[in-house]
Amino acid sequence: MVTSVEPIRLGARRSPLARAQVALVSAALAARGVPSTFVGVTTRGDVDSRPLSEIGGTGVFVGAVRDALRAGSIDVAVHSLKDLPTTPAEDLEVAAIPEREDTRDVLIGCRLADLRDGVRVGTGAPRRAMQLLDWAARAGIDLEVVPVRGNVDTRIARVSSGEVDAVVLAAAGLRRLGHLTEVDPAETDTVVSSLQAEILDYRVMLPAPGQGALALEISRSLSIDRRAAVAALDHPTARAESLAERGFLAALEAGCTAPVGTRVVVKSVRGTTLDLTLTAVIGRTLVSNLSEPPKADPVLRFEASGTSPKPWDFGVYQAGQVLSALPDPPRPRR
């Protein structure tokens, strides 16, 4: 328990989703007798409305929050893990990755079976656009993917207003905001804000590395008692799966907006050794030296399994397997 009477200051963006995520962390701390308070931070991604790929998507939602950590105005930064750059900050550390939310994506506005030629689907993520277009090509459908940004409610409103026919959003964010109610695991049809929706199967849409996970980042100089209070929220399985996914992404030298979808599952644990499976989909645009891919196969798919005591290293190794199998592996980006 934190011995100081001062509450732990939780810093995050001011968006409704960020606040909801802070509320979850605050409740988890309170359950352990640890008081906390919210400190809002405005990030570059909040004030620049351009597509993330244009403003340098890596870290645009976390830079200002990290600066607040370094300045000592907050004790803990509450991030969506997928937004964190894979390159670690030497003066900061992720003290906890709490239990992970649903890692799937949700199509809002219609079901996959309802998609037809000319349907406009909104997303701001190259990963989602890549997989949507790949699915549509295999289904013989000519979809139009429309770039959209904004918070969850803003993007849902674009469907209600008719600006787009559907949008794709993360199930985790929808659940944390109370927009997505529980459904039978065998069912994928649901309703979001009175709109028809479908929870997408992993065979259609793989998540971003770390999707659905929170990262509780602290300064390495944080006091021992506060560090311990935060570390108590760590979930070993969530950490292992997320680290493996992010190791895979890092080894591909891809930023967090790169067209890479990855899912790692811890199948079993034997002592300190983890039995892991990895499934990935990679946009060919990431592999710049690869010759023109066949039209029937616009993305690279990869599956692997193995054992390792170090999830990050497992992800790095599997990315190496992908790159070594390419006919002309790309040179590292400078």
Language-model features: where?
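Short, small/hydrophobic-residue-rich motifs at membrane-helix boundaries and re-entrant hairpins
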Residues: 19, 23, 58, 71, ...
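Helix N-cap/beta->alpha junction signal
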Residues: 14, 62, 125-126, 171
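Small-molecule-sensing regulatory modules
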Residues: 2-42, 47-50, 54, 138-334
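Short, structured active-site "lid" loops
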Residues: 50-76
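Short, Asp-centered acidic motifs that coordinate Mg2+ and/or phosphate
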Residues: 74-78, 165-166
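A conserved helix-loop-strand patch within extracytoplasmic ligand-binding domains
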Residues: 81-84, 88-143, 214, 223
